[in-house]
Amino acid sequence: DKDHPIRNWTEHQREVFSVDWNNIQKELFMSCSWDGNVKIVRVYTDQWHPERPASIQTLPPHGACVYKAAWSPHDPTVLATACGDGNMRLFDTRIPAARPVATMGVGGEVLSLDWNKYRRMTLASGSSDRTVKTWDIRAQPAPAQSVLTGHTYAVRCVTWSAHQSNILATAGYDMTARIWNVDD
């Protein structure tokens, strides 16, 4: 039925900004919100009931809007968040209380992030300071691998190519979409 979703969650206290499916543990889904929370839901379960909370895990509050949360395409327990406090955080859901295993200070509100599909330890971020940064998360604290400039307003979206490990697409509030070769 096109007018009725098969599942509906109402656990967030503010607008939900982003959702993402876990590509490895296919029953896991997460949402993030302006309320600063990230909620992980096991979608396909017989215990689901519309009057009970559906989330199986809530990450510690970020203290600011979480604009984007994305599962790693390489590890089913690892995810990254892009936050309005200027930080990108990495979480391993196996760690008790799900504290961040790493925090990267990006600068400006972090509006977007994306995992590289081929380079398992590489992330890209886009932020309100008009920069795009790539990160090698093996080094902690992780310095930015590259800083791409050129957008004249905030960078709202970053997406790695599904076909080439070095190609990154970005979109900004400057009304432009750009393609970058991060190896140049």
Region spans (language model):
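Loop-centered beta-sheet repeat module
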Residues: 59-91
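A short beta-strand motif characteristic of beta-propeller blades
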Residues: 4-9, 54-59, 99-103, 143-148
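Conserved strand-to-loop turn within each blade of WD40 beta-propeller repeats
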Residues: 31-35, 42, 82-85, 93, ...
